[in-house]
Amino acid sequence: MDELNACTECGFTTTVFSEFQGHIEKHENEHSRSSSGEMSNSQTIEWGDGIQSSTPSPRSTPPSDPTPSPDSDEHLEHHISITEITNTLIKKEPGTKGQKTVHVCPHCNFTTCMSQHMKSHLEAHERHQGQMYQCDICKMQFSQKANMHRHRMRHSGVKPYECRFCKKRFFRKDQMQEHSMTHIKTGFGFDCPVSQCNMQFSQHNALRAHLEETHTISSTNPASCKRCNLMFANSRRLLLHFQTRHDDSESSPKKENTPKRKKLSNGNALPMDPANMSITEQLQRMVKSEFSPPNTDTSDNSTSSEFDKIPPSFPMANPDILLMCLNQMNQFNGFGENIPRPMLNIPNIPLPALHNIPAVAAIVKQDQVQLWSEQTSSSVSVSAPSPSEQSHSPPANESSLSLTEKEKSPTPEKEDEENVECCHCGMMFYDNTMYLLHKSLHSDGDPFKCALCGTQCGEKYMFTTHVIFADHSTQATTSA
């Protein structure tokens, strides 16, 4: 069998040596006509019968002593090393202006258009002999496992990186960044990416000229990004990093500072005073002030009065979770419907059909009866005078005048009855009914144990949070 002759410059292979010699002479004539003269003389690799020229073994090295053809010239007879392959092993189609040169690795199927990448790849073959990571599909080898996995995604067809301008997808992140630069260059108003440089340019070419002339960025004099202080030894890489990583927020159109939408309220809405807020709003404010971290950002407007008027972001399962105690209408005999709706600060809607435990209703009903009996006895004592008072009673007009004055002037006892404080939570209630509803949520033995579901909270803030956000409808359904 004739020996196979392969051209290292363009990959041409033939077993007829006369054809191969004419092919080599054609390359030499082209090199003599070219003015560059940088291309070295072509070299020939002759492979044995048991070695394939197109796809050699992935982990094998080139033959240390290839056998040349007996009629070959002198420039085809010397040894081929790794450095010589780096400079001469290319596949080139001359004659077309601007066409890229494709470099082919002799050990695996790695190809690239950049000579520096090929040089690094061949050096990796030399350093990691027998330890390269190989793709199981195309047998291409890599010195790093991450690069092999990145290459493996090409075979899967998944393109994880998307251009934010045209939504085109890419296999590799650097390819997506290079593509994004084609969109970024068409814009205007470019900032210099070098830290402590506030220069701005209207055109992208002017910015690149500024980086090359003003900032001499090199390996000995690296420059840092003005946003993240990452160091770069190449101006092009710095510009690519800055305009694809950080400049997306700057290049986007700035939004106008429009006033925030305020919470809608009717004309009869009460001011934000603790006396006029519902229990839910008081609990929400107390929990928010305790659990929210301190605001150290001066630019944040979350503490402004306008922000407080925005409705809370967390959802509420019911209009007022404390109305869970008012669901059993038969035991209360219409007690829940008699509570004024403005006092509860909720719309005029029917109460939620929740099924609470009967003990809560009994406690509220008993306390309400006691409160009603105390008010009745006090009113009877005021309206029914004693016999001594009847004997020394003033005239009818004077007694009526004194009664009206007593009604107009509030007594200290009445003020104390209106302002009731929970001894466990420290919350102030300006209505006895709301205090009784809140009191029924505490268990008798443990004040911080929820009387609705039996959850042990431990302290007042956890108890308050549990009362506001816990979903007691499931326990109510099971108890029913």
UniProtKB/Swiss-Prot annotation:
Region (Disordered) residue spans: 25-75, 243-275, 290-311, 376-417
Family to which this protein belongs: Belongs to the Ikaros C2H2-type zinc-finger protein family.
GO biological process, one term: regulation of transcription by RNA polymerase II
Pfam families: zf-C2H2
Tissue: Expressed in the somatic gonad, hypodermis and cells in the head and tail. Expressed in amphid and phasmid sheath glia, amphid and phasmid socket glia, and in neurons in the head.
Taxonomy of the source species: Eukaryota, Metazoa, Ecdysozoa, Nematoda, Chromadorea
Keyword RNA-binding assigned: no
Compositionally biased region (Pro residues): 59-69
UniProt feature, compositional bias: Polar residues: 34-45
Record key words, sorted: Metal-binding, Nucleus, Repeat, Transcription, Transcription regulation, Zinc, Zinc-finger
Protein name from the UniProt record: Zinc finger protein ztf-16
ZnF start-end (C2H2-type): 5-27, 103-125, 133-155, 161-183, 190-215, 223-246, 420-442, 448-472
GO cellular component: nucleus
Record's subcellular location: Nucleus
Record InterPro entries: Snail/Krueppel_Znf, Znf_C2H2_sf, Znf_C2H2_type
